[in-house]
Amino acid sequence: MAVWLFGGRLGLRGRLSACRLLCPRFQSRGPQGGEDGDRLQPSSTAAKIPKIYTKTGDKGFSSTFTGERRPKDDQVFEAVGTTDELSSAIGFAMELVTEKGHMFAEELQKIQCMLQDVGSALATPRSSAREAHLKHTAFQEGPVLELERWIDKYSSQLPPLKAFILPSGGKSSSALHFCRAVCRRAERRVVPLVQMGETDANVAKFLNRLSDYLFTVARYAAMKEGSQEKIYKKHDV
């Protein structure tokens, strides 16, 4: 996966000015790209297309944005991988949402871009980061506040909750509930990194608000589509 390898792919020396994430993909390859460690070579006459596979991760190690090699099951990569999974789930939900004409599809795409920034921040563990690394991967509070505004906008249009609801309410709503569950898992992967001082607390805040946003728009989609949300009922034996 290349989510955390932007710096490794381009090289750090003389290239930090290029270390901004581009929506919806990195300037190198996005999270669908190959393994880590491959560096783009200067073009001589014709541009060469880099290979998807590089074999540099065959021994079970990957590189962080700082260039540090860690096992692939390291907490950093667990967090990065789960946020990538979340973005993929949101991409699937977005297709269903778009088919139904929901206007918040544009917000979902923007959230995918935000998750790229989250991945970049997570892939820059502070224990091995220099100031230049942190400068280009800092995750600010702005996205958190934007999510809160969106949540308030849709919540004001929804009927109040009077019981626990089950993931339901049509395809769009159910897909968004699935995204919410993945988001909660991503948050659980990030919290230990925040507690260890390896990443910014704003990352955990963002994922926390994002799960609330996904819950809210799942209900909103069900309401707009006229689909009924299923209510939890205690099973009596």
Curated annotation (Swiss-Prot):
InterPro entries: CblAdoTrfase-like (IPR016030), CblAdoTrfase-like_sf (IPR036451), PduO-typ (IPR029499). Pfam families: Cob_adeno_trans (PF01923). This is Corrinoid adenosyltransferase MMAB. Its EC number is 2.5.1.-. It catalyses: cob(I)alamin-[corrinoid adenosyltransferase] + ATP = apo-[corrinoid adenosyltransferase] + adenosylcob(III)alamin + triphosphate. Belongs to the Cob(I)alamin adenosyltransferase family. One of its GO terms (molecular function) is ATP binding. It comes from Mus musculus. Residues 30-49 are annotated as: Disordered. Residues 1-26 form a transit peptide. The modification N6-acetyllysine is found at K224. Homotrimer. It is found in: Mitochondrion. Gene3D superfamilies: Cobalamin adenosyltransferase-like. GO terms for cellular component: mitochondrion. GO terms for biological process: cobalamin metabolic process. It is an enzyme of class 2 (transferase). Its main location: mitochondrion. The modification Phosphoserine is found at S128. It comes from the Eukaryota. The modification N6-succinyllysine is found at K205, K224. The gene is Mmab.
